[in-house]
C-alpha cells in the first residue's frame, strides 16, 4: 500500500500486514480473551519477528493505531455498558455508610477513604462483640482488603461461607485468571449478606454488621468494575509511553498529533501500511476521562433504600429469619451410685461396714465382695494385703470373719453364710446384717437351725476332723500359690523332695506376720492350717 490514506500509519512491511492486522482486529473486537492492554505489545513484537529492544518504531506505530481505534471499538463499548452498574454500586455503598457511620462519612469522601471507614467500623464491631482469636484473625483479613481486582480474604468470623464474598471472588477469578467478560445483571440483593452469614449478634449489632458488610461488598463491586472498565486504556497508554520514551528519549506528548507527525516522517513506499480508523485522534487523557465517568455519585441510581429494607425486615436474599424455640431445661444429673448400691446386697453391705446400731463396730478386715475365700487368699497375700487375721473375741463385739456373698460354692446354696457356722449373735430386727461366724469357744457347739456348710466339716465331728480338713486345705493353698506365682511347677519329685521344674522368684511371704507365734509356712508364707489354729489353741 502506498500513498496517504485516512487512518493510522503502521510502519511494518506489507508482507507482515496480514498477521498483524488479524492480531489487532482480535484485540479491538475482544474476540481473543487472552489479549489485554498489558500484553498486546509483546504479541505485536512476536507477530513482526522483532527481537526485544529492537523495532521500537514499528511497535510504536502499531500501538498508536490501536490507541486511536480503542474508544469506538467493540471491546471498549462492552465495558462502557457497565459504567451505570459501577456508579450504582458506589452510590449505594456511600449512602449506606451515611446511614450507619455518618460521623466517618462525608459527601467529599473518595472510594478509598470510604473503604477505610467501613473496615474500621467492622474491626471495632468484631472486637467489641467477641474478640476471640478467630475475630482477631478476621481483623487481619479486613486490613488486607485493597481497592482493585483482588479477592476478598476471610473477614467474617464464626461463619463458614458468605454468598456475596463467593460471588465477588468468582468474578475476580474470571477477570484475572480466565480473562473473561463481565455480563452483570446487577441486583443489590446478591450483595446483601443473609442473617446466617454473619456472627450471632444482638438485633441492633446484626443490622449494623449486615449494613456495613453490604456497603463493603458494593464498594468492592465498584472497584472490580472500575478496573475492568479502565484497565485496557491505562495499560495501552503505559505501553505507548514506554516505547515513545525508548524511540525518542522524551515523555509522551500532551497532543496525539505530535506522535502522528513523528511516525509519518518514517513512512516511505515499502515499509508501511495503514489501519483504517474512524473519528479523530484519541486524546491521551482518555483514561482519566473514562475514570471520571465511573467515579460518580448519582442518587437516581442508588439502591441503598432497597438494601436497608431487606436488612430491617430480617431477610437476606429473600429468605426470612426463622424464630428458634427455647431449649428445654437440661435434666439434673443423678448422684453417682456407690459400689455398695450397685451390688445386689448393697444395703446390707453398707450397714454391715457401719456396724450394728447402738453397738461397737466389729473388727472387719478389708473385704473384696467378689473373690472366694480360698482362691483369693493367694491373691491377697501376693497383692500385699496380708494374711487373713481373725481378732480374738471381745465381750462387746464378736469377731467377724471375712464375708463373701458371691464367690464360694457355699454362697450359691446359702446366701447368708460363707465361713464356719458357729454360735453367732442375733442381729437386731432394725438392721439386716449378714450372719457373723465366730471361731471362738468350743467348736463342738453349733447354733440350732443353722445350715450345714459343705466346704467345712461339721463341728460335731470334733476338732480332729477339723485339723485334718485344714491340712488338706494347706495342700490346696500351695497349689494356688504356684498358680498365681507366674511360673507353674511341672516335673517329677526328686528323692530330696524337690521338683525338677523352675520355681518363681515371687515372694509370697507376708512380712506383716513374720513375727507371729506359731511360725509360718516354708518360705515365709502362712498356711491356712496355722491361720485357723490361732482360734483353736
UniProtKB/Swiss-Prot annotation:
High-level lineage: Viruses, Duplodnaviria, Heunggongvirae, Peploviricota, Herviviricetes
Domain of life according to the entry: Viruses
Keyword Cytoplasm among UniProt keywords: no
Biased composition (Acidic residues): 492-517
Disulfide cysteine pairs (residue numbers): none
UniProt feature, compositional bias: Polar residues: 334-347
Protein name as annotated: Tegument protein BRRF2
InterPro entries noted in UniProt: Herpesvirus_BRRF2-like
Localization terms from the record: Virion tegument
Chain residue ranges for the region called Disordered: 325-474, 486-537
A single cellular component GO annotation: viral tegument
Family listed: Belongs to the lymphocryptovirus BRRF2 family.
UniProt keyword terms in alphabetical order: Virion, Virion tegument
Composition skew (Low complexity), residue ranges: 423-441
Amino acid at each position: 500500500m502506498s500513498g496517504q490514506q485516512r487512518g493510522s500509519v503502521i510502519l511494518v512491511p506489507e508482507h507482515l500486514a496480514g498477521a498483524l492486522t488479524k492480531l489487532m482486529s482480535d484485540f479491538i473486537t475482544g474476540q481473543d480473551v487472552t489479549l489485554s492492554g498489558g500484553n498486546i505489545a509483546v504479541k505485536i513484537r512476536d507477530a513482526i519477528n522483532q527481537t526485544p529492544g529492537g523495532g521500537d518504531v514499528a511497535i510504536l506505530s502499531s500501538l498508536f493505531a490501536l490507541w486511536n481505534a480503542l474508544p469506538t471499538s467493540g471491546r471498549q463499548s462492552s465495558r462502557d455498558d457497565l459504567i451505570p452498574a459501577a456508579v450504582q454500586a458506589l452510590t449505594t455503598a456511600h449512602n449506606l455508610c451515611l446511614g450507619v457511620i455518618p460521623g466517618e462519612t462525608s459527601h467529599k469522601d473518595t472510594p478509598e477513604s470510604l473503604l477505610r471507614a467501613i473496615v474500621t467500623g467492622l474491626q471495632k464491631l468484631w472486637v467489641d462483640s467477641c474478640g476471640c482469636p478467630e475475630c482477631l484473625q478476621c481483623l487481619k483479613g479486613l486490613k488486607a482488603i485493597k481497592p482493585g481486582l483482588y479477592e476478598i480474604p476471610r473477614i467474617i468470623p464464626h461463619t463458614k461461607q458468605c454468598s456475596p464474598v463467593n460471588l465477588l471472588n468468582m468474578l475476580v477469578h474470571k477477570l484475572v485468571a480466565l480473562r473473561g467478560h463481565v455480563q452483570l445483571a446487577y441486583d443489590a440483593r446478591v450483595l446483601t449478606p443473609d442473617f446466617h452469614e454473619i456472627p450471632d449478634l444482638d438485633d441492633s449489632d446484626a443490622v449494623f454488621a449486615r449494613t456495613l458488610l453490604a456497603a463493603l461488598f458494593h464498594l468492592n463491586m465498584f472497584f472490580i468494575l472500575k478496573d475492568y472498565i479502565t484497565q485496557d486504556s491505562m495499560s495501552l497508554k503505559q505501553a505507548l509511553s514506554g516505547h515513545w520514551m525508548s524511540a525518542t528519549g522524551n515523555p509522551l506528548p500532551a497532543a496525539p498529533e505530535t506522535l502522528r507527525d513523528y511516525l509519518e516522517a518514517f513512512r516511505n513506499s515499502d515499509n508501511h501500511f495503514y489501519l483504517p480508523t474512524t473519528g479523530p485522534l484519541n486524546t491521551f487523557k482518555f483514561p482519566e476521562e473514562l475514570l471520571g465517568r465511573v467515579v460518580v455519585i448519582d442518587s437516581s441510581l442508588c439502591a441503598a433504600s432497597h438494601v436497608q429494607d431487606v436488612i430491617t425486615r430480617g431477610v437476606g436474599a429473600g429468605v426470612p429469619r426463622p424464630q428458634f424455640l427455647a431449649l428445654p431445661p437440661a435434666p439434673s444429673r443423678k448422684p453417682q451410685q456407690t459400689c455398695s448400691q450397685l451390688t445386689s446386697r448393697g444395703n446390707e453391705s453398707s450397714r454391715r461396714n457401719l456396724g450394728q446400731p447402738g453397738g461397737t463396730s466389729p473388727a472387719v478386715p478389708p473385704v473384696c465382695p467378689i473373690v472366694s475365700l480360698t482362691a483369693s487368699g493367694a491373691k491377697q497375700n501376693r497383692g500385699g494385703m496380708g494374711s487373713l487375721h481373725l481378732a480374738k473375741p471381745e465381750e462387746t463385739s464378736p469377731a467377724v470373719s471375712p464375708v463373701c456373698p458371691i464367690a464360694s460354692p457355699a454362697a450359691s446354696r446359702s446366701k447368708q453364710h460363707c465361713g464356719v457356722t458357729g454360735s453367732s449373735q442375733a442381729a437386731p430386727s432394725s438392721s439386716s446384717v449378714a450372719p457373723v461366724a465366730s471361731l471362738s469357744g468350743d467348736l463342738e457347739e453349733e447354733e440350732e437351725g443353722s445350715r450345714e456348710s459343705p466346704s467345712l466339716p461339721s463341728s460335731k465331728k470334733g476338732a480332729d476332723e477339723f485339723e485334718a480338713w485344714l491340712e488338706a486345705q494347706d495342700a490346696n493353698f500351695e497349689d494356688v500359690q504356684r498358680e498365681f506365682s507366674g511360673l507353674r511347677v511341672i516335673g517329677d519329685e526328686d528323692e530330696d523332695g524337690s521338683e525338677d521344674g523352675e520355681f518363681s522368684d515371687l515372694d509370697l511371704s507376708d512380712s506383716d506376720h513374720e513375727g507371729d507365734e506359731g511360725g509360718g509356712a516354708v518360705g515365709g508364707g502362712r498356711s491356712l492350717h496355722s491361720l485357723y489354729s490361732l482360734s483353736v489353741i
